[in-house]
């Protein structure tokens, strides 16, 4: 779902919405238009200001992210850090999460403009953990199982499992419109066992609306 109006987010929160994840993808305004030439998604300001609208509507948790591979990743993640700092100042009751998905082979065969190594991704996660001790750091199934298992002990707080990358993928089959390839194909149960083997407790849900009363 593309970024909505504040009143739409508010209605959704009143209906039980807990969190919203919206990837800015890149903070490079001119290049953003190259990647998104048409429709509402092409309006840079509408997308980047969508996080304010979420905060104004009282969304409990806001997820942010840039797509590593589009533009210089150091610039993009620095801009996201500044954006996160701004949001924390203005919507301090909201929780935040960040994600740094690296581009993988896709249906459109779009090749990354920038390559980030495993060491660089780990360095970035460490830097964000130092920058913001409380932010949730998510690592998606774009990354391989070995990397995810190791980084879960070194700064990441959330790892996905059983992900579908095609539009409507959780409701339709087969994956006819897959947007990118999944590297870690373990089932949720298998990921759960891996986390437990590390000595950690698996938490599937960490919030409920009743806690805000």
Predicted segments with their positions:
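Catalytic cores of alpha/beta
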Residues: 5-14, 60, 71-85, 144-155
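Residue-level "edge-of-site" marker
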Residues: 2-3, 25, 67-68, 141, ...
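Conserved strand-turn element in the central/C-terminal portion of the radical SAM core barrel
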Residues: 4, 37, 50-76, 99-114, ...
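Aromatic/hydrophobic pocket-lining residues that form the small-molecule binding cavity
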Residues: 44-47, 77-80, 121, 188
């Amino acid at each position: 779902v593309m970024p909505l109006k504040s009143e739409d987010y508010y209605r959704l929160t009143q209906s039980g919405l807990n969190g919203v994840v919206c990837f800015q993808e890149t903070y490079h305004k001119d290049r953003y238009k190259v990647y998104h030439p048409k429709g509402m998604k092409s309006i840079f300001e509408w997308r980047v200001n969508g996080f304010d609208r979420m905060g104004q509507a009282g969304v409990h948790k806001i997820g942010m992210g840039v797509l590593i591979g589009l533009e210089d990743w150091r610039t993009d993640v620095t801009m996201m850090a500044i954006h996160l700092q701004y949001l924390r100042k203005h919507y301090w009751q909201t929780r935040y999460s960040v994600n740094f998905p690296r581009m993988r082979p896709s249906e459109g065969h779009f090749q990354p403009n920038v390559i980030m190594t495993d060491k660089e991704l780990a360095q970035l996660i460490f830097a964000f953990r130092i920058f913001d001790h409380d932010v949730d750091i998510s690592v998606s199934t774009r990354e391989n199982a070995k990397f995810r298992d190791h980084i879960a002990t070194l700064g990441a707080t959330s790892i996905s499992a059983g992900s579908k990358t095609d539009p409507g993928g959780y409701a339709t089959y087969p994956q006819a419109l897959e947007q990118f390839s999944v590297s870690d194909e373990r089932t949720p149960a298998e990921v759960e066992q891996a986390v437990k083997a590390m000595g950690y407790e698996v938490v599937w849900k960490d919030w409920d609306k009743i806690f805000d009363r």
